Amino acid sequence: MDIKNVTETISMIEEQNFDIRTITMGISLLDCIDSDINKACDKIYAKITTKAKDLVRVGNEISAELGIPIVNKRVSVTPISIIGAATNASDYVMIAKTLDRAAIEVGIDFIGGFSALVQKGYQKGDEILINSIPQALAQTAKVCSSVNVGSTKSGINMSAVRDMGRIIKETAAASEMGCAKLVVFANAVEDNPFMAGAFHGVGEADVVINVGVSGPGVVKRALEKVRGESFDVVAETVKKTAFKITRIGQLVGQMASERLGVKFGIVDLSLAPTPAVGDSVARVLEEMGLEAVGTHGTTAALALLNDAVKKGGVMACNQVGGLSGAFIPVSEDEGMIAAVRAGSLNLEKLEAMTAICSVGLDMIAIPADTPSESIAAMIADEAAIGVINQKTTAVRIIPLGREGDMIEFGGLLGRAPVMKINKASSADFIARGGQIPAPIHSFKN
């Protein structure tokens, strides 16, 4: 083995904050469906604690063997709206508590899948689940929730968008951390290893291992070596770096799936930042020549980064999936936080950036008195970007505090300045409800 590659890898881990962000085990709960909610909960608990009992131990063993930090071990499950629909329960908080209890028992960091897919309309279980979200998140520590309100094939369910504006407000009122564990999607993917949007799709195998990597610091260090060179060189540098990062992700995923005796799913190519200095996507964009993220040129820089990461990653791994792109969560990226506080990055520019990257308005704090209709309208805008561009977009927004306040979440969730929003009303627009039809270019058959 080339000694240069060995020292490069050591440097990536020790100096540039490279880590495996998550090993996520997807578990199907379709065989746990029961008309009696108590029996369903017993089956759910038994299956998760059986299938995931060794996940944390195996993750720690691989981390120690390879010398690579594996930050989170997580589980995603079949959308609970499907599982709960067979019961006559009026809410699914009991199922959420069961998921939480199972997550604590096996020692994982988060469990995702308290979810509903309502892009074309509500079924019984969907409506019950959505109305259960505020209390489900308030009464659990590790449960994450997501709702898919639109898709390129179906259009946007504006009645669901309206409801989610209300649910986000209710969730914020019920618990300070609840909204950090709630994502509203368009074009949600079935094999996402990242929280809070992970759920195990019904088309997946019974149990699967998916891996998410994190390496903005590694990319930034590589770009420092080509300062002032053309964008051709920048793109090639990012591509080669993404190849190395993804190779390690694939190795970890294969080792984990072999030891756990389950199928290896995908590596998610997303560059996921943390609040630590030196682990920021914003600083990567600034390294390309921007004085501060949010200035003119930011969207173009992000487009180059996103595309080069995908090209490098696809060459390194035979199974790529999830969201796969650059994440731009405000609270989880110290460069984004600095740009918001300096006034160079606002909500409108973030929205433009979401037309490029793999997520939407992520971990953004807005004033607590923001009307539910304005939150719903933000969701509608993001869903429209995703639906028209045939890509995944999302909103994870936290109505808390007053404009200019700094909200502390702690850990990987970081801290977020409360951002200014447009005060003009969207209430009459949101009140219409109904369905925004699928775009003309969605008809492929």
From Swiss-Prot:
<protein>
    <recommendedName>
        <fullName>UPF0210 protein Ccon26_06850</fullName>
    </recommendedName>
</protein>
<dbReference type="InterPro" id="IPR007841">
    <property type="entry name" value="UPF0210"/>
</dbReference>
<comment type="similarity">
    <text>Belongs to the UPF0210 family.</text>
</comment>
<dbReference type="Pfam" id="PF05167">
    <property type="entry name" value="DUF711"/>
</dbReference>
<comment type="subunit">
    <text>Homodimer.</text>
</comment>
